[in-house]
Amino acid sequence: MTWIDPLGLAVDPITKLEDRGYTGVTKTSGGGLDYSNSHALYNKRPGVNPVVTIEYSGDYDIDFQRANAKAGLNQVSTPRGYVWHHLDDYDPVTNKGTMQLIEKQAHRGINHNGGVSQYKTATGIEYTHPARNSGARGCD
């Protein structure tokens, strides 16, 4: 038997994304979201790869810097209006996972499981992020 939302308040993340105009996002077998076939994926500059594999650090800012470098952005900060999404394919043996550079509006307020929650389960370590104190939120 599956859970039924008695008040009808739970919103499927794919439905929420489609309501925002983002199509092509798929649910992974682990309950995460894969943006690789969505127009939410960064495509502003030629030569930039918006899907990269990095070694997880336990710190959002460090992960974002690593992903920026690996993507070929040649900058420390993530492009304005975009955020790096930790796909839910974290490998505890290699400590690596896939990052996808997507529009913030396709990530903000969309509940999903991601590589960060897999990292926490595998290591027992919480991810850190200075912006979290100001209300920003990364992947779980």
Predicted regions, residues:
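Nuclease and nuclease-like effector domains acting on nucleic acids or nucleotide cofactors
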Residues: V11-V83, L87-D140
